[in-house]
From Swiss-Prot:
Lineage: Bacteria, Pseudomonadati, Pseudomonadota, Alphaproteobacteria, Hyphomicrobiales
Gene it is expressed from: recO
GO terms for biological process, alphabetical: DNA recombination; double-strand break repair
GO terms under cellular component: bacterial nucleoid
Function: Involved in DNA repair and RecF pathway recombination.
Protein name: DNA repair protein RecO
UniProt record similarity statement: Belongs to the RecO family.
Pfam name, any one: RecO_C
Organism, scientific name: Bradyrhizobium diazoefficiens (strain JCM 10833 / BCRC 13528 / IAM 13628 / NBRC 14792 / USDA 110)
InterPro entries reported in the protein's UniProt record: ARFGAP/RecO, DNA_rep/recomb_RecO_N, NA-bd_OB-fold, RecO, RecO_C
Keywords carried by this UniProt record: DNA damage, DNA recombination, DNA repair
Amino acid sequence: MEWTDEGIVLGVRRHGESSAIVELLTRAHGRHLGLVRGGAGSRMRPLLQPGNSVSAVWRARLDEHLGTYAVEGLKLRAATLLASSHGVYGVTHLASIARLLPERDPHEEIFGLLEHSLDDFDDIGSAAVHVIHFELAMLAELGFGLALDNCAVTGETTDLIYVSPKSGGAVSRGAGEPWRDRLLRLPPFLRHGETATELTDQDLQDGFRLTGLFLLRHVLEPRGQVHSDARAGFINALTRQQARAAIPAP
């Protein structure tokens, strides 16, 4: 058995004295593990960092075997990602939720979204938007997508500013007003057909609250899991950055 594919490094663990078991999210073969001989050595370590894109050749005698990887670097983002706290927490969190995908099951849209997200991670505000969109996409990919295109009560497609915490459906301003205190806020950058001209700190916090609730309820808790420490670390880094930006210059 042999195939060649692009992959994004999700994680690495040492195996024996010098090898490593590498977990990739590949474009055509899904989340896939393999042994890299010499992967724990100084030459390969910088290549096998979470967030890096590699070209991987996987070989095994039988399809169900772990197999071995021969990898070459395509885009080495890790040094940049790991230079900031939001980058460290962000790539760790994205890898942890990508790991929720079943092994060896192709998810090309998720691969493309992860690749695009990691390529635009320098600014913490942009990174936060990418993380929220990735969490939404993962909910949909795992069968728990939110219905944000029209109002769950009236069917309207405009003025959608709330989300029902029960159904995961959008709710229009008029329909939701009597229950506004019980509803989640739908930030402008997630509203169907709208282009957010400004991104506020509250928008980002509302986005994380929205995706966090449904990820926990539908995906994590049934598996006996909770949100990763990396997710909390990313949100804390975002909050600190927002607080610094709000302090007026002397």
